[in-house]
A protein has these predicted regions:
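Terminal-proximal segments
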Residues: 2-44, 51, 57-59, 65-67
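Active-site helix-to-loop segments that bind/position phosphate- or nucleotide-bearing substrates
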Residues: 2-6, 13-14, 22-23, 37, ...
Length: 306
């Protein structure tokens, strides 16, 4: 039998995400499995998932992390209901040319403004006002976002006192804020997987800054009111017994029906292309790789075969 080396498949061909909790994650007989306390194994198709959210109660073996990295699947360790990210394994972001391109766009003020204006246009489906700084555009954006929250609350008959929650005390927040937090966390997970698969850095943002996922927030904010926030209000209006669980399942279905995994990388490239520059070429005196990376079917940011 011929052995076929493992390699990533494109993000567009993957399921968006799954959540795992209460079990040991390991590789047995070559398969990525979750083993519960009674010893029952659940096979996880790790190579066909963009992002695996690991909730409290999970333990992960070295072999499982290695396999996930080899096939380009993002592992994210999260808190209760997936709303607090503790750490993540980065299977992508492996393109120096794209990282330098992203950094130049973020550090050059006029280029950054072009990118931010494009984000505004995509988010609100209209060109931003002319002759506005990034700070001014952020102010306009913030006002429109608050109005959108208020309109959604009115539409679904939900009491709304503003966007606020305590990440250290999940149960303290009201139902609608918990639903929104759970929904946006799902979107952040799949958005981070896309940023890494495309070869970029999650931390180098254009509107957000100072966070490990600044660029992820930038990208997710473009689409969150089209996809997940209305669903969060809809679920909150029903007052279900387990709102966060319902939100996660609904987000999974939305991501599948909207084919989001196939749209995120083109969205990222469209946003950055607004800067109207080309990715930098290596300096003439730089050494090429001694051992070139093998060609794979994966996206440009994936690290290839392990």
């Amino acid at each position: 039998m011929t052995f076929v080396p493992l390699s990533p498949i494109p993000l567009k061909d993957r399921t968006s995400m799954i959540f795992l909790q209460y079990g040991q994650i390991d590789v047995l007989d070559g398969a990525f499995v979750l083993i519960n306390k009674t010893g029952i194994r659940t096979h996880i198709p790790v190579g066909s998932v963009a992002c695996i959210m690991l909730e409290p109660g999970t333990r992960v073996s070295h072999a499982a992390v290695h396999l996930a990295a080899t096939v380009g699947t993002l592992l994210v360790w999260v808190g209760e209901a997936g709303v607090r990210v503790y750490s993540s394994g980065q299977p992508g972001g492996a393109r120096a040319d794209k990282l330098l391109y992203q950094a130049k766009l973020a550090l050059t003020e006029d280029l950054r403004l072009k990118v931010v204006r494009k984000m505004y246009e995509l988010r609100f489906r209209e060109p931003p006002p002319a002759r506005r700084s990034v700070e001014q555009l952020r102010g306009i954006e913030g006002s429109r976002v608050r109005q959108t929250y208020a309109l959604l609350a009115k539409q679904y008959g939900v009491k709304w006192n503003g966007r606020k929650y305590d990440p250290k005390d999940w149960e303290k927040g009201d139902v609608v804020n918990r639903c929104i937090s759970a929904a946006t966390s799902c979107l952040y997970g799949i958005s981070e997987a896309a940023v890494l698969a495309a070869g970029y850095a999650p931390a180098i943002g254009f509107i957000h800054s100072g966070k490990p996922l600044s660029f992820v927030y930038d990208i997710a904010d473009i689409i969150k009111f089209d996809l997940v926030v209305p669903k969060a209000f809809e679920i909150a209006a029903r007052q279900p017994a387990e709102p966060d669980k319902e939100v996660r399942l609904a987000c999974r279905d939305i991501f599948r029906s909207s084919k989001l995994t196939g749209k995120l990388i083109p969205l990222i490239e469209e946003v950055l292309a607004a800067g109207e520059i080309e990715p930098p070429q290596p300096a003439p005196d730089m050494l090429p790789p001694a051992i070139p990376e093998p060609e794979t079917l994966g996206d440009s940011g994936h690290r290839g075969r392990g």
